[in-house]
Structure formats: C-alpha cells, structure tokens
Amino acid sequence: METWHLDIEEFVELRKNTGDDRRRTHDMNTANWVPDLFMERVFEGKKWTLFTPNETPDLHDLTGAAFKKRYEEYENAAKEGKVKVFKEVEAEELWRKIISMLFETGHPWITFKDSCNLRSPQQHAGVIHSSNLCTEITLNTSEDEIAVCN
C-alpha cells in the first residue's frame, strides 16, 4: 500500500499481535511503497495528506516529479473542498508508526517507490507496484499480467 492511501494507518498495524483480531492478518506479508515526497515532508516536519484512491485514481501510477505535482494539486483541491475524503497527519508521526510496526512485527516492508522506478531497467513496462518478499526484486505488472516471485 502506498503512504498516501487513507487506510495506511490501519494497514501498518495489520501484523500487530495485540488488538481486535478481526483487524489483523497474521499470515499475509505487507509492504509500504514510500514516495520521496513523503520522506521530504518527514525531514522538514511538515504535514502529509492521506487520500482515497476513489478521488485520486492517478496517484498510484505516478512517480517522482509527476507524483509530487499531482499530489500537491490534490492537496490544494482538498483545501478548496473539491476532494471530499482526506485526512491530514504529521508526516513524522506517520513515519514513526510505520517504523515502530516494522520494529515490532517485521512488517510492513518498506520500499521506496521513486528509487525503484528511477533505477528500473524496465521503465518501458510501466510503473513498478510490487516486489518479492525481501523487496530486492521489483516486479512489473499490467492489466494483462500479474507478476509473482516465489
């Protein structure tokens, strides 16, 4: 799941051993795809806006400068009331939650989306959205083919 997704706070806790078991998954491997912009906001002590993919459908397929431009457009649209479902959080606080869960449970694995896509030798195949379990092998997917690494 990407860090801008509205459900990211609940997602990072899926592997937690305490709490309501109906909100946990003990056998699923989870990964968080982090854009550079999020880390910039963490370092700068700024806010981060969470969105629903229903209102921001193109963010999933954007990286780097294109992601930053569109993400900031959605933030402005949210402030103007054009985006209805969103939540502002402190970027550093969200990062601490992610890192705390990684330390506590080993999940979610963190993959830096912009770095993976910038260095991909298969950029012609589209944006990388997944990897193998240890995140050292990135996998292209498309509407016609789902990538799997066993």
Q: Can you say where each PLM-predicted feature lies in the sequence?
A:
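Active-site cavity-forming subdomains of large catalytic enzyme subunits
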Residues: 1-150
